[in-house]
Design a protein with these regions (language model features):
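Short, conserved "active-site rim" segments that organize catalytic pockets and cofactor/ligand binding
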Residues: 2-21
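Glycine-rich phosphate- or other oxyanion-binding loops that anchor nucleotides, phosphorylated ligands
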Residues: 2-3, 27-230
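Short glycine-aromatic motifs
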Residues: 20-28
């Protein structure tokens, strides 16, 4: 039985995971609620970290230190940057970058982190398994893309900002946790992957799109996760 840590940022994302879990129990650590249970034959520990990079990094280290997870999966919603993505499409993060990390004053590219580099790569085996799981699903009214996910402590509603991130990093979507989780896992040598479903469009009304589609995005990620864990 594999022991897998799953991180989400919001309540809608958490509920979608709990809907597919069995034998759920709770453990409180530092004011955070970790839910343990099973999906298929896998032991699962899922936690809602809250929004942002520090919150995400914090729970990642707790999952590794306290629960001894063998891999970490981050699922949830993201905003599209690529014009090729539509609401509900899935992005499997091949590599991640912190678009707001800036030490360009020291002659490094934006996004470069000392001791880490710029792009952090997800585990190749996990990528291939998630691609297979996504393609096994009967629903085909959405695209599945392996690509680049950008992370920053900004909820991007400004079209100009989104275009700059897309242009600079060639990122497919943007969110607020994934690359922080990736950095902790990279430093701790723990396999990880980030899966995002598009909840707002690159040129639409992001706040309206997000509120309307976040539940759909969360359920779609949960369905792919369940297929992956079979």
């Amino acid at each position: 039985m594999s022991k897998i840590g799953i991180i989400v940022a919001m309540e809608e994302e958490l509920e979608s995971i709990l809907d597919i879990m069995d034998n759920i129990e709770e453990k409180e650590i530092y004011g955070l609620t970790f839910k343990t249970g099973q999906i298929e034959k896998n032991k699962i520990i899922v936690v809602k970290c809250g929004v942002g990079k520090v919150n995400a990094a914090r729970v990642t280290q707790i999952l590794i230190d306290t629960f001894n997870v063998k891999c970490v999966i981050n699922v949830g919603a993201a905003g599209a940057l690529s014009p090729l993505l539509n609401l509900g499409d899935i992005v499997i993060g091949e590599k991640l970058i912190q678009h707001d990390f800036d030490i360009t004053a020291f002659d490094h590219d934006k996004g470069y982190i000392t001791g880490v580099g710029d792009y952090i790569y997800s585990d190749i085996e996990l990528i291939e398994k998630f691609k297979k799981a996504a393609n096994n699903l009967k629903e085909k009214d959405y695209k599945i893309k392996t690509g680049i996910i950008a992370t920053g402590d900004i909820f991007c509603t400004d079209i100009e900002m989104k275009n700059k991130i897309f242009s600079k990093f060639d990122a497919d979507c943007v969110e607020m946790e994934g690359a922080a989780i990736a950095q902790v896992c990279y430093l701790d040598n723990i396999p990880f992957i980030v899966i995002r479903s598009i909840s707002d469009s690159p040129n639409g009304n992001n706040e309206i799109d997000f509120d309307k589609f976040v539940e759909l995005a969360s359920k779609r990620c949960a369905n792919i996760l369940r297929e992956f864990l079979k």
